[in-house]
């Protein structure tokens, strides 16, 4: 096994809590807030996959907006333009998970290159990383917008290798999303799934190498693997 040189993270759902945009305005949304947040996320991801399959790329902000429109209409809230605008503003400033900053800092201190590989475009990522105080803890922020293909297409993971000048076997890829872990594992990355709520394992043809319940466990795992 090659030594791990780079720790590459998914952003949305892994370092950044995608539910905080809706939860920030839950009192205005009412009892459907959790369902709306879940549907928004589901459609956002679905649109990224279908557009990649169709060869009809649009940036992640457009997909995020279109997915929110669908979710709001599904709950009879599409006419609430003020609510839509506030939710989109909140998505630009998603909260980071509490252990994200400390984990990234510990990895950098241990000598690992830290990077994000995200479907988000650069403008989205800059705002969210700044709001979450993550900018200084990352060596690189890699957006699929540069190649206009979404994860989990293998070309995206190769793009990260090219940007970081590493082989797949030298990458530890970290994500909370099973589909992303499956794609990264099939490509050849060493994968770690952050499974905060103990969801069942998926994509058995490319299972995660390791599973953790929090980001804070990651530095110790990597130090153990590199000894």
Curated annotation (Swiss-Prot):
This is (S)-2-haloacid dehalogenase 1. The active site is at residue 10. Keywords: Hydrolase. InterPro entries: 2-HAD (IPR006328), HAD-like_sf (IPR036412), HAD-SF_hydro_IA (IPR006439), HAD_sf (IPR023214), PGP-like_dom2 (IPR023198), S-2-haloacid_dehalogenase (IPR051540). An (S)-2-haloacid binds at residues 11-12, 41, 118-119. It catalyses: an (S)-2-haloacid + H2O = a (2R)-2-hydroxycarboxylate + a halide anion + H(+); (S)-2-chloropropanoate + H2O = (R)-lactate + chloride + H(+). The keyword rRNA-binding does not apply. CDD domains: HAD_L2-DEX. The record marks 14, 151, 157 as: Important for catalytic activity. Gene3D superfamilies: HAD superfamily/HAD-like, Putative phosphatase, domain 2. Its EC number is 3.8.1.2. Catalyzes the hydrolytic dehalogenation of small (S)-2-haloalkanoic acids to yield the corresponding (R)-2-hydroxyalkanoic acids. Active with 2-halogenated carboxylic acids and converts only the S-isomer (or L-isomer) of 2-chloropropionic acid with inversion of configuration to produce R-lactate (or D-isomer). Residues 175-180 are annotated as: Important for catalytic activity. The keyword Isomerase does not apply. GO terms for molecular function: (S)-2-haloacid dehalogenase activity. Belongs to the HAD-like hydrolase superfamily. S-2-haloalkanoic acid dehalogenase family. Pfam families: Hydrolase (PF00702). (S)-2-haloacid dehalogenases may be used for the biodegradation of halogenated substances and their derivatives which are widely used as pesticides, herbicides and other industrial products. It comes from Pseudomonas sp. (strain CBS-3).
